[in-house]
Amino acid sequence: MKTYIPKNDEQNWVVVDAAGVPLGRLATLIASRIRGKHRPDFTPNLIQGDFVVVLNAEKVALTGNKLDGKVYTRYTGYQGGLRTETAREALAKHPERVIEHAVFGMLPKGRQGRSMHNRLKVYAGETHPHTAQKPQTLEVR
């Protein structure tokens, strides 16, 4: 019996509106779409997921006290260079990175995960330059 390897020829584009949607709920939906876990022929060693375009990133909802309690940290590489910012500051400066950070934490951490990063396109406003790909809208429950 030969091993079945599914074809990876179907590249779908999906648009998700993030306005008023909780960040974790949005990130889990996006991560599973990028990995391709919604497909009946899901194969873990192949990248079969969709391209996901996220709109209205600045209007994403953070429940509870997470706007002030959630802290993003990064290290500059220099001594004493640990930089922190709250979720409120991050949403004000660069709202795209908040969604990207949440989604990338849910993707695999190897070579495939890094190539899956290219399938996520996040925009702060309502417009996007991917209309030529004819993306389908996806509702978040």
Swiss-Prot record:
Alphabetized Pfam families for the sequence: Ribosomal_L13
Annotated PROSITE patterns: RIBOSOMAL_L13
Cellular component GO terms, alphabetical: cytosolic large ribosomal subunit
CDD domains, A to Z: Ribosomal_L13
Coiled coil: none
Keywords: Ribonucleoprotein, Ribosomal protein
Subunit structure, interactors included: Part of the 50S ribosomal subunit.
Protein family (similarity comment): Belongs to the universal ribosomal protein uL13 family.
PANTHER family assigned to the protein according to its UniProt record, in alphabetical order: LARGE RIBOSOMAL SUBUNIT PROTEIN UL13M (PTHR11545:SF2), RIBOSOMAL PROTEIN L13 (PTHR11545)
Protein known as: Large ribosomal subunit protein uL13
